[in-house]
Amino acid sequence: MSTVAYSQTNNLTGSPYSLFGLGVQSNSNIGRNSALGNGGLALGSDRMINNLNPASFATIPKSSFLFDIGFLGELNTVSNNNRDENRIAANFSNLALAFSVNDKSGMGISIVPFTDVGYALIGIESNVEGSQDNFVSNITGSGGLNDLRLNYGYQLYDGFRIGVRTSFLFGTIAENEQVLIGDTFLNIDEDNFYNGFRFGVGFQYDINNKYTIGFTTDLPTRLDGTKDRFITKTLDAILTEEVNESGLDINTFKLPMEIGLGIGAKPISGLTVNMDYKRNLWGNTDQRDNIGQFTDQSIFSIGAQYRAREIGLKYWQNIEFRAGFNYDSGYLKVNNQTIDNYSFSVGLGIPISNRGSSMLNISYNSGRRGVVEGILVEENFSLININLSLKDIWFRKIKFN
């Protein structure tokens, strides 16, 4: 029998579900996408960087340079059968730049969080095997993986674009466990290091001037890992034993094939609608977590954006209004219960330059993850994404009168 209480963390996430696998998939997005249900496979990169589909980089206007930096704040309310607890996390969320190579191609580089870890299990009471004695453990985890990504898009012919991307995934997941057994205190620090490459492709096709379809696929890959471990044991506050190990091999972590299909539509002037579906084939990785199994994941998203004028002469005509919805079936099943989540989003694009070519993007997401059942908890989360998206023209000639 064990009892668990959750405490506050100050990492990029405070989700207790970041305990599983490599952590929770990051809520970070570049530019407008977080307000559009985290979707946009068929959207271009003509105004802002769209990191979801490498083919979009072919839409960057000639001689243009795009830059984006973001910040993410998160409030989580975790509920189980005994209590509710609030957690706050905030951090840098992305850095990206993109530019046109020529009038038919563009490329970009970005770094964004890939997974986030930030959990704390406080006061885990367990029995010493073979006796009536109890011991208490406190376990905390932090860190996550980053995605350093290079995108390239090329327009094969008018209305049809292809793209390729390469990601270098890397990062550290740290866990600390403190165990108290009578007068003996055990402290265990483990740092798990992962890295690996991943490759993907995409295309976009303009059916006409109102409808575009987008497609992406990311190939399955393996992330190699090593572990450093440092253990200290004290008795009556006196250090009695110390163990320091480094470079220990750990199991590789498999990432699945991911397939995405999106539709973009412009039904009326100023309105853009995006709808995406993604399928991540976790079941094919044939791997398990300590307390669950991986299952295929489906992600649905829909978003809409309205702007009064393409190039408005008045300031308010360049403001962009956005809203979206996202449903994620989850990829981990615990006690035959899949940990799914959903979220609603709203946002604004606030012009900070003439004609609205550069924007301050602000979005708010509200959603739920998991259910109160057995060892599972329900997590209600609120996210605020703030992105500064800048656009400029390279090699512009300056004329003097």
Could you describe each region identified by the protein language model?
Residues Q8-N401:
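Subset of outer-membrane beta-barrel
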Residues T3-S7:
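Sec/Tat signal peptide C-region and signal peptidase I cleavage site
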